[in-house]
Amino acid sequence: MSAADVIQAWDQADPSAIHPLRQVSEDAYWASGEAQASMLASVIPEGAKVMDFGCGDGRVAIPLAALGYDVTAVDSSQRMLDRLADRAPDLTTVQADADGVASHLGRRRMDAVYALAVLIHHSYADCLHIVGKLRAATKLGGILVLDWPVSETPGEADSWIGVTTWSRQQQADACAQIGLERVDSELPWGVYRAVKAG
């Protein structure tokens, strides 16, 4: 699927389809966001300027902001951002895809960027493009937390709810090209430091 197809499917998704815990209960869904915000806080410096790329309705962005982070919530779907604003009207939101992030930031860079349940839906080429744009939005030495799974049998998703996986070598090559250095972490997602590419 192209990035445009993934974005369109995401924008049209029923709220109950965007996360499996929402089918359990709304409380379980929002509690999972609080738990993930706490995990992110273990690797992101206190009070940092943070971008949640692909924030959806704010499941993680809202509790991370409540922990004292300066969160900018970015999503390609205005419908998702409207749902977020209903719960947290003071949270900064930006409607943009990866290509639109730079125009919002201008010369500013974030201390940290995270993308959870975003990259898994995209092709290899689109994922590399997105990660490159997120790296460019991050200060040198900043932190990126990416839900970017590896597998012994990597493959590209064939639908927007599929999961694209990478080999360790594919990821290592991408990191060297983009300017990411893997950081040891207990998190269930990859944690990277923004370094010079090459």
Indicate residue ranges for each PLM-predicted region.
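Active-site charged/polar residues at nucleotide-handling catalytic sites that mediate phosphoryl
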Residues: R108
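Conserved beta-strand/loop positions that form the S-adenosyl-L-methionine
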Residues: F53
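Short catalytic micro-motifs in class I SAM-dependent methyltransferases
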Residues: A117-V118
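A conserved beta-strand element that flanks and buttresses the S-adenosyl-L-methionine
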Residues: Y114
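Conserved acidic residues
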Residues: D111
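Class I (Rossmann-like) S-adenosyl-L-methionine-dependent methyltransferase catalytic domain
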Residues: M1-G47, D57-L105, H122-H129, K133, ...
